[in-house]
A protein has these predicted regions:
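Conserved functional hotspots at enzyme active or ligand-binding sites that engage polyanionic ligands
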Residues: 1-93
């Protein structure tokens, strides 16, 4: 999973959609914040340079055709699994 910065938006975002830049050029992202309380949907994540808490319940669809963005980092496989499980848990009931 890639960590990106989106033009005109503060902070970092974690791309949680499977195909980051597929034919639709859209991505589902979750914001990353530096400080908030931890709970099952707020998961710590870090790359080589970026560290924060992913707010899994705040997913957004972003059309990257109309927004500037840049890739800044990536997270490990184990972090990816934890975040994917949390997001999947939102929809399992």
């Amino acid at each position: 999973m890639e960590i990106i910065q989106i033009e005109k938006l503060k902070g970092y975002f974690l791309v949680v959609s499977k195909d980051f830049f597929n034919s639709t050029e859209q991505a589902i992202v979750c914001p990353m914040v530096k400080d908030t309380f931890l709970d099952p949907l707020h998961i710590e994540a870090s790359g080589k340079e970026v560290k924060g808490i992913v707010m899994c319940e705040q997913m957004r669809l972003v059309d990257l055709r109309y927004r500037g963005f840049k890739r800044v980092d990536a997270i490990s496989y184990s972090q990816r699994i934890n975040i994917t499980d949390a997001i999947q848990g939102i929809f399992d009931y």
